[in-house]
Amino acid sequence: MHLHLLFLLALCGAGCMAAGPSYSLRGSWRVSNGNSSLELPATVPGYVHSALQQHGLIQDPYYRFNDLNYRWISLDNWTYSTEFKIPFNRSEWQKVKLIFDGVDTVAEILFNNVTIGKTDNMFTRYSFDVTNVVKDVNSLKLRFQSAVQYAECQSKAHTQYRVPPECPPVEQKGECHVNFIRKEQCSFSWDWGPSFPSQGIWKDVRIEAYNIAHLDHLTFLPLYDNTSQAWTIEIEASFDVVSTKPVGGQVTIAIPELKTQQANHIELQHGQRIVKLLVKIRKDVTVETWWPHGHGNQTGYNTTILFALDGGLKIEKAAKVYFRTVQLIEEPITGSPGLSFYFKINGLPIFLKGSNWIPADSFQDKVTSELLQLLLQSAVDANMNTLRVWGGGIYEQDEFYALCDELGIMVWQDFMFASALYPTEPGFLESVRKEVTYQVRRLKSHPSVIIWSGNNENEVALRVNWFHVNPRDLGTYINDYVTLYVKTIREIVLSEDRSRPFIASSPTNGVKTMTEGWISKDPYSTQYGDMHFYDYFSDCWDWKVFPKARLVSEYGYQSWPSFSTLQKVSRQEDWSYSSRFSLHRQHHGNGNNEMLHQVQLHFQLPQRRDPVRAFKDTIYLTQVMQAQCIKTETEFYLRSRSEIVNGEGHTMGALYWQLNDIWQAPSWASLEYGGKWKMLHYFAQRFFAPLLPVGFEDEGVFYVYGVSDLHKDYPTKLTVRLHRWSSQKPLCTFVSLSAVIKAGEAMVLFQMPVSKLLKRCKECTRDTCVVSFYLSTDNELFSPTNYHFLSSLKDAKGMVKANITVSISQKGDLFVFDLKSSTSAITPFVWLDVGSIPGRFSDNGFLMIKKELSVLFYPWKPTSKSELQQAFSVTSLTDLY
């Protein structure tokens, strides 16, 4: 445990009283189970599972079938306890508080054997007045109740009508009634994750002492007035005033870089008080705005605020303040029924390019700063500008949002309600009110957060009747829905934060949903709001199966993670596609067969007899399939941004499902557990590029669109080439010299009937040739090289097995992989792998159209040339047969 005294940033003079001491109770505690047969040290913040693993009482919970083997841990009731001395004289302070930033989840709290309160919500901060019970030496206990048992009890107590779903699908091997507890919803299992409803103190816990007044929270909300064309900052400070007399004083705000300093007089009455201040930014000073990644800088301004209060109390805080505006534009579109649905940042329409974020681990104490940095940097490295924090996980750590601010990642923030109906008893709603108020105040200062969304998929679940409720009861469930998301959550958001939009659900029809009583008649409409779309049976190479929607905030296909990732949590008997382990790890019903179905549409299944080799080959093919499917779908959304076809289009967002993994298993992720890039993530780096040529066929005609995320028009040259699979030398080249791609638009650059294309390249047929194309300026490559297959690759003719050799050299902190192919044929889907060595390549999963190629490797931890050489392997499609 550590003492943190909150010293002022400026030195106090005579008679000045510094803010009181803050004593962290982080560190070593004790944890014991219900019958005291187990007692062991436990680290706080932390979880029971982590303590048991750390002391050798259990294996890695993710190993093989341990999610089932260790179910007993979540069904037991655990107690955390500690003793501590306070390093200050308690008689000198008017108030002493015990503060928990996060308790997971249901616990009775005993301070010196006195029950001071209970917790039942993982997502809120708890503060307890211990002034009258604190001693020089103190004991603290948290008696947890099993979250599984609590949820079951709450469900049984709800006798009027069922609140489905009662239990998850059997494939998920999860627990029931998660909608009755304010806990990470996926901790009871999901279709990509295990069931580990653990118990623990998952965030900081501390003792705070103070006199006169205490600053509980402080927020900064920059607002732009279009009429005056000036910025103001709305500052909100929440105080706990312990003085029985009114407390006067002065607050001074300083932003040196903006030449802004302002002083205001304030007076605080006894009790919980909120002070709101407006700081006007000088109009003669240029304010640099915060921009999403790829659109500008993430400029922030160092700001200090000093509260000089009666009694000599001075409280000074420092923060970085960012200026940006966000608008959700829903307005009529020429040539289309319905309304637009897109975001303007600082007045500029922005196409949302990115993915969906889930918790990075079942145990948040394992999510380090380094891991968050790695995962979020990987999103930026793949040219993403948006992540949707999905509503079945957690409101992320402070550091997550700070990193998003710094990296320019826009955050679509769900509230934590997902794929379920929820109760609306007074106690439940009161807990939700505290949760939402706390989270909005915690997060609203972050420029990265651009929208609040009330829930994940609960509107569509009601309308389509996912849970088979009796139609006669639908009115009851709709009333509960409106009570929770509109009358409770929405009202709090509108009162706490007027700077960003709110939608009640995702997907939603936006204002159309509102006018239809919050449950839209057609939540799958392509002409309003956002959409979630999944189709595992239609041919994913056929772009016509995808919806030409306004914004697609979920879509995806599964794949298996790398063998090196699985190897850490399995053993040799598990290494086949049909093993018990493979079936156990797949939590999506029929998921393994769905992957093979998509693979077989365009590829032959592996033919090697070695079962482990066949397993590795199948893993590889699922990653190829996933990458190619999502490439096709994403490129369709990208090229639909500037057109209306049959009343549909103006697509302004593509957020595929999902970015990251919670454990080592088949899922929709592009980043494996721990951060290793799947093939999809390398593809995303290309298809989310700022300037991209997109090729496709329609009614026998081959088109190339130019898609731009740039802020100005660019004259470019489009080069289209046809190659035989058997030769890297292009047979034909078509060049368009006068292509001017307009800023922020998608436009046709090239079109030609495929029959004419093949006729002009006389030695080409659909089966023997492939098309590549790229944009350039003055012989400089200006876009990724893209490609279009003229046939399924299982029908392709002329492919030759390639023996690709590598020479590795070190260049500073990087490594250069010089690749050389033994054949002059084109090699599809070349996959470079260095096993478990952390890092990523500059490119991967590519078509090798040159005999020699250099690729960079960026290590995430120190490594050596010899380690890389030993771990290196290369796989291509031709190696499988």
Curated annotation (Swiss-Prot):
| Keyword field | Disulfide bond, Glycoprotein, Glycosidase, Hydrolase, Lysosome, Signal
The record's subcellular location field reads: Lysosome
Q: Identify the taxonomic lineage of the organism of origin.
A: Eukaryota, Metazoa, Chordata, Craniata, Vertebrata
Under PANTHER family, the record lists: BETA-MANNOSIDASE
Recorded name of the encoding gene: Manba
Q: Which reaction does it catalyse?
A: Hydrolysis of terminal, non-reducing beta-D-mannose residues in beta-D-mannosides
Protein name per the record: Beta-mannosidase
Glycosylated residues, per the record, are: 35, 77, 89, 113, 226, 297, 302, 803
Q: Does the keyword Hydrolase apply?
A: yes
- Residues reported to bind substrate: 190-192, 456
Enzyme Commission no = 3.2.1.25
